[in-house]
Regions:
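Selective hydrophobic functional segments
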Residues: 24-80, 84, 166-216
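Transmembrane helix-loop junction
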Residues: 13-14, 21, 67, 71, ...
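Extracytoplasmic gate region of multi-pass secondary transporters
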Residues: 135-137
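Transmembrane alpha-helix interface/packing and boundary motifs in multi-pass membrane proteins
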Residues: 5-6, 122-131, 169
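Single conserved hydrophobic/aromatic residue that forms the stacking wall/gate
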Residues: 1-5, 9-10
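Transmembrane helix exit motif
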Residues: 36-46, 83-109, 222-230
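Small-residue-enriched transmembrane helix starts and helix-helix packing motifs
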Residues: 110-126
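Membrane-interface alpha-helices at helix entry/exit sites of multi-pass transporters
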Residues: 17-26, 50-54, 148-159
Length: 230
């Protein structure tokens, strides 16, 4: 979960909760886990902090907007939205699963790169606030394909972006009283453990670990789509 996020796995643990409560409680759990994963990548210097912060600013705004949109939608619309978006997400991950693991970034930060980082954060943050599954993988794809980072650094940048988007959505849901803490706290503990373990392997193994995990995300997305159809 430190690589791709755990939205699709954890939401299934909230069976019986209305969709809005599921979104909110899941976001609490995800925010807790992502905090520890981000700390691990920061400690190991596996991120471009300037790019990560700019992306986080965009992500915070996008995710807050996405969460507010979710609150305005009915349960039926939310379920239909997931049904439409998940197969599209799966296709994108399948198409871009074999990402190059080379750092083509020259280390400078000009206006073009700054705006690109903000744009990546805004777009992925909006997706995370409204949908969630695969957010980390989409961020890695964006940072490698559009900004030329290697997989390890792209993963670290994605952590900063995802941290901001998680907390932006969480603050929105907390203000609406939608987080079910008796359910969310045990899931948060599991999420933290998973993120710590996942970060350890991602940092040590790099692309050898990250690429297979992207395929795992694809399988989980497709699996969720199939189960939702049944």
């Amino acid at each position: 979960s430190s690589l791709v996020g755990s939205e699709m796995c954890i939401r299934d643990s909230f069976a019986g909760l209305p969709p809005h409560y599921t979104y909110a409680t899941n976001k609490f759990s995800a925010a807790c886990g992502t905090t520890f994963a981000t700390a691990s990548f920061f400690k190991n210097g596996a991120m471009n902090l300037k790019v990560g912060i700019l992306a986080a600013i965009g992500s915070f705004a996008g995710s807050a907007l996405g969460a507010h949109i979710v609150l305005m939608l009915s349960d039926e619309v939310l379920q239909m939205m997931m049904f439409i978006i998940l197969p599209i997400a799966a296709v994108i991950i399948l198409w871009r699963r074999n990402l190059p693991d080379e750092n083509r970034d020259d280390g400078t930060l000009n206006l073009k790169k700054a705006l690109l980082a903000l744009g990546i954060g805004l777009g992925i943050g909006l997706y995370d606030g409204m949908v969630g599954p695969g957010t980390g993988t989409f961020a890695i794809i964006a940072f490698t394909s559009l900004m030329g980072f290697d997989l390890r650094t792209a993963n670290g940048n994605a952590k900063v972006l995802n941290l901001a988007s998680n907390y932006a959505s969480l603050f929105t849901y907390l203000s609406s009283g939608l987080v079910v803490f008796p359910v969310g706290i045990p899931c948060a503990i599991s999420n933290i453990v998973g993120n710590i373990i996942g970060s350890h392997f991602a940092l040590r193994k790099g692309a050898k670990f990250i690429r297979p995990m992207m395929l795992v995300v694809l399988v989980l997305l497709l699996g969720k789509l199939i189960t939702d159809m049944l």
